[in-house]
C-alpha cells in the first residue's frame, strides 16, 4: 500500500520579526498549502514542531491554526493532520485541545506520558495513518521535542538524557516493528538538531544533556522516512530518507 504525505515544520505562527507581524506571510503560506492539499489529497499532513513561535501564543495565532485545520478538513476529509511540539511550543497546550482537533481529523503529540505501569506510554506516540478506506497504510512514530524532565527517571535505562533518548527511540521503534505489516510504512517524526544538519541564523539553539546534536544512528534502518523539524532549511541528513522540511 502506498502512503502520500506532506512534511512541513517550523510554522512559527504568531511570530514578530523586528516588531513586524508575519501574519500576512503565514496567511499566504497556509493558503498555498490548502491549494496543495486540494490538488494532491494526501493521506497525512505532518507538522514536525514549532507550530507556534512562543509557548503562550496570541489568540490570533491560535485562531490561524484552527481555521487552517477546519479548511484543510473541508478540502480533504480523509487527511490526518499530525503535529508534534517543538522547543517553541507548549506540549501540554497543544494537547489540551484534543476534542477540537479530533473534529478536524487532527492529532497533537506534545509530551512524553507515563502509562498505568509508570513506563513510557508508547501508545500515545505511535499513530496509524489511514487511507480513504480506513486501512492502515503507515505508522507515524511521533517524537516531540524531548525535554529531560519528561524522559528521565523511568528506569535504569533513563538515568540521564542521552541514555533516555536512545532508550525511547529503541522502545518506540521496537513497538512499531511489532505492529507493522509488510505493506505498511514507518515514518518517524521528530523535532531535534541532528548531527550533520546545516543550521541557519533563525533557529533558537536547543541543548539536551549538554550535547545539542543527536546522531542519526538513533533511526533503525527499518524506518522508511524521517520527518524532521527545527533546522530552518530543507536538507537531507546523511541518508536520502532523513530530511528536514
Residue map of PLM features:
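Extended recognition/assembly regions associated with phosphoester-bond processing machinery
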Residues: 1-47, 51-245
Amino acid at each position: 500500500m502506498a502512503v502520500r504525505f506532506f512534511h512541513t515544520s517550523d510554522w512559527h505562527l504568531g511570530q514578530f520579526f523586528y516588531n513586524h507581524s508575519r501574519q500576512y506571510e503565514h496567511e499566504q503560506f497556509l493558503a498555498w498549502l490548502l491549494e496543495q492539499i486540494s490538488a494532491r489529497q494526501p493521506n497525512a499532513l505532518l507538522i514536525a514542531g514549532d507550530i507556534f513561535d512562543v509557548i503562550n501564543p496570541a489568540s490570533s495565532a491560535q485562531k490561524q491554526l484552527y481555521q487552517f485545520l477546519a479548511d484543510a478538513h473541508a478540502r480533504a476529509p480523509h487527511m490526518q493532520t499530525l503535529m508534534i511540539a517543538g522547543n517553541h511550543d507548549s506540549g501540554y497546550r497543544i494537547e489540551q485541545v484534543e476534542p477540537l482537533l479530533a473534529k478536524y481529523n487532527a492529532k497533537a503529540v506534545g509530551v512524553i506520558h507515563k502509562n498505568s505501569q509508570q513506563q513510557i506510554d508508547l501508545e500515545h506516540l505511535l499513530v496509524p495513518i489511514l487511507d480513504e478506506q480506513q486501512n492502515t497504510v503507515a505508522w507515524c512514530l511521533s517524537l516531540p521535542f524531548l525535554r529531560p524532565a519528561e524522559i528521565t527517571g523511568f528506569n535504569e535505562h533513563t538515568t540521564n538524557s542521552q541514555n533516555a533518548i536512545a532508550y525511547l527511540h529503541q522502545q518506540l521503534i521496537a513497538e512499531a516493528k511489532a505492529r507493522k505489516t509488510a505493506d505498511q510504512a514507518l515514518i518517524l517524526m521528530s523535532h531535534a538538531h541532528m548531527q550533520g544538519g546545516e543550521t541557519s541564523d533563525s533557529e533558537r539553539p536547543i541543548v539536551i544533556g549538554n550535547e545539542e546534536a543527536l546522531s542519526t544512528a538513533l533511526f533503525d534502518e527499518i524506518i522508511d522516512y524521517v520527518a524532521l523539524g527545527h533546522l530552518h532549511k530543507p536538507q537531507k541528513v546523511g541518508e536520502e530518507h532523513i530530511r528536514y522540511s
